[in-house]
């Protein structure tokens, strides 16, 4: 199973220049994908931000949500909870990061995504974030695309 961060999954539901890459990746998957329950909040905020600055019309934001909900309800998207296992994994990842000669700067929510992926035993992480990609590689998690 693959874990998708919110920016990656959003590219499936909101057209971006590289959306086709993520659509193909999702289509060739072998089952449901994992996302953090926190990703839902990030998706809502991203859609609101895109609508507010004029990158999306409000009806396009609604359409993205209308597409996401059935995929989630059908079990194609598994929402992984935020619990003690994720917190412990985040601590382990940061301990590994601190031991590096040059640690990788990481935002809190990105660390939660990575820790959730590892705690959920994901085989790979789908993200576009350069720092998250580097930290996932350090934690020995395969990164896509």
Ranges and model annotations:
Residues 77-128:
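Active-site neighborhoods of divalent-metal-dependent phosphate/nucleic-acid chemistry enzymes
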Residues 1-63, 130, 139-144:
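Short, well-structured N-terminal submotif of metal-dependent ribonuclease cores
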Residues 19-21, 66, 111-114:
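A generic local structural motif
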Residues 69, 114, 133:
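Short glycine-/small-residue-rich flexible loop motifs, especially phosphate/cofactor-binding loops
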Residues 38-97, 138:
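Active-site-proximal, substrate-binding regions of enzyme catalytic domains
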Residues 25, 116, 135:
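Hydrophobic/aromatic ligand-binding patch that stacks against planar heteroaromatic rings
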Residues 82-84, 105, 136-144:
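Internal alpha/beta domain cores that form substrate/cofactor-binding pockets in large enzymes
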Residues 25-29, 70-71, 119:
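A short, N-terminal amphipathic alpha-helix
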